[in-house]
Amino acid sequence: MSDGITGALRNAASVVAPDAIRRRFGAKFAVAFIVVLVVIAGAGVFAFQSTETTVEHQTTRQLAESNQLEADAIGAWMEQQRTHARSVSQDEALRDDRRAAPYILLKDQLLPADVVSMHLVNETRGTVVASTELAIEGRSLAELDAPWTTAAVPEGPGNDSAVWATEQSYRSPVLNDEPVMAFASSVPKREGAHLVVVTRIQPQVDRLSDANSTRRTTILNTGDEPVLDSNSRFDAGALTDSIAAVRNDTTAATTTVSNGRVYALSATPHTDWVTVTSVDTGEAFAVRDTVGQTVTVLVVLAVISLAIVGIALGRHTVTPLKRLRNRAQDIESGTFDVDLSTRRIDEVGRLYGSFDDMRVSLQDRIQEAEAAVEEANAAKAEAEELRTDAEDAQAEAERAKATAEAASERLQERAADYSEVMQAVADGDLTERLDEDADEEAMRAVATEFNAMLDGLEATIAQVAGFADEVADETLQVATGAEEIETTSQTVSERIQEIADGAIQQHDDLERAAGEMDELSASIQEVAASSATVAETAADAVERGEAGRDAAESAIDDMAEIESLSADAVDQILALQERMSDIGDIIEFITDIAEQTNMLALNANIEAARADKDGDGFAVVANEVKDLAEETKQAAADIESEIQAVQAETDETVADIRATSEHIDDGVSTVERAAAAIEDTVDAIEDANHGIQEISDATEDQADATQSVVRRVDDVADISQHVTEDAEQVSAAAEEQSASVAEIARSADDLRDRADALATTVNQFETRADADEPDADTTVDASADDTGD
């Protein structure tokens, strides 16, 4: 299978590659180098684009998830504040103005620290009936500058659970102009009354901003205005379509890039608000830029490394072989005056030296042959004198000439064979070898050195191929390990997510437990307050009993004085009765005057009628006098009736005083018995007071203990919240790690592909190891080459 593929690729390369490239090893090396460069650059561009897309997707997804978490947190906070307002407003204490003030003061201590103040508003009267802020209590709503003074709070059947909230935060003078929000809930069974709960939102504002980052979160109301910070400004013009899409589908979330920032939008639960989270693109895609730089550096390093290898191989192998091939062709054509000197001492240098020795040896043999021919000619001339000797000398000269010519032909044939072998080696066939079985020592040295150089070159190529295979194997192991790490990271992420879900459930349970503990604490504190009230009442009863005892003792003394005073009162009332008779006479006199005045007014009217128009003014005065007389007469009648009533009551009073005087003696004895009974009652109340004081102290201790439990439950709930947030952060980190491991795996795959490409390039050289291993992958005569000096 491998041989078939290799053969097919070789045939395809032979068809595609022109003969000019196939005949030159340097050209093939240059083409191979360019192909590898293109492959590496393409892989780098693909890796960068793939990584860029993945990182951008992960960044926007993480921003959207963070935006959704913040929206859920704001929605939960709003629902919690509505629950506070709704639960506090349902109590019966708010239906009585006298009980409302201590009730909201107590609730203010029990609710979380974010609650700034509470106000009971009577819309009918337009006043604040009770408030935790004494400066506001009793004031008119028109005098206050706060949004809740004009709140349209739903009330009536079916609206007891409805809670009104401000559309935007406002600055509270109570908190030094810190941002707050108000929540209002109607009081059941009390028309025109609702409770206002004012809550600080600075912790929410601080949580949504990070001074060390460009990331910002803004909550927009229905008018696209910031809710939590009314002083801030937000340009929602570029996000109009996205905001409308979120409002139309509250379950949808969207992301967009605009004005150099990445935006994530989602609906805020339990409200009609939109949560917008944004971050600068430079910060959001910093990882993408870093990965791009890393990929670029890897590609550049790979290109530089390949260039160094190509230059080294080309400069130290291809170029010397080309020069040596040209010198061998000169020698083959009969030009022996060629320069074969070199400063290299490796196999190539020794090969140059062997060729130079061969050139010198061949030149010496030719010179010897020419000298032999000259000697033969001289001998032939001398042989003319001695024919026999000359014939022998001539024969010997001819034999010497034949020997020299044969040696010259053998040298030329050997040089031609060596040239063919070197040409094959230059074409990439490293399995060829020079025949070392030569008669001439110089030729044997040339063959030996050249073959040694080819052995070294074969070893180098084999090492490079082995290194490429090892790199491929190692990258395969790295990719496998990266996949295992990615699987483990995903498992860890799932486990951490399960832990986060459990922590959220635990946090919810703790919040419910905290609410129940709050109610229990409130009940115990009410019992403690009632116990304290009873204790104070008992103590007051003791004091009043003691005062009653003292009063009873003094009452006995006062009875005698009352008895004497009652006699004096009878005398004074009798004198008063005589004065009343005198007043009656005066009233009769006033009545007579009024009747006479009335008669005068009547006469004046008669005269005015006679005077016609000239008497209009006189008639008016007469009418006024008449009216005054009538009023005087009526007043005199009223006074007379009152005097008669007073006289009747005076008579009754005289009778009562006399009867009272008779009962005073009986009262003295009764008061004495009551004083004794009060003494006994005071003692019993003192004993009861001691017991009630002990109960009050025990109840206060229980209330303090319950408050401590509530605080601890709140602390545990806060810890649970932190655990949940940390678990979510760890889960996000695990997902990022999984993504990074996936990138490592992809990079390892790219490296393995490049190693395979290098192995393919190296396998273009035919070596004896390939010939000895028929089952191994054979080389491919690809059109890939590298150049260098």
UniProtKB/Swiss-Prot annotation:
Keyword Transcription: no
Domain HAMP: 315-367, 409-462
Family matches, as PROSITE patterns: CHEMOTAXIS_TRANSDUC_2 (PS50111), HAMP (PS50885)
CDD domains assigned: HAMP (cd06225), MCP_signal (cd11386)
Stretches the record annotates as Disordered: 763-789
Extent of Acidic residues compositional bias: 772-789
Domain Methyl-accepting transducer span(s) in chain numbering: 481-717
Membrane topology recorded in Swiss-Prot or TrEMBL: Multi-pass membrane protein
Family matches, as InterPro entries: Chemotax_Me-accpt_rcpt, HAMP_dom, MCPsignal_dom
Electron transport recorded as keyword: no
One cellular component term from this protein's GO annotations in UniProt: plasma membrane
Intracellular or extracellular location(s): Cell membrane
Pfam families per record: HAMP, MCPsignal
GO MF term (any one): transmembrane signaling receptor activity
Post-translational modification, as annotated: Methylated by CheR.
Keywords: Cell membrane, Chemotaxis, Membrane, Repeat, Transducer, Transmembrane, Transmembrane helix
TM stretches of this protein: 29-49, 294-314
GO biological process: chemotaxis; signal transduction
Family: Belongs to the methyl-accepting chemotaxis (MCP) protein family.
Role: Potentially involved in chemo- or phototactic signal transduction.
Name this protein carries in UniProt: Transducer protein Htr6
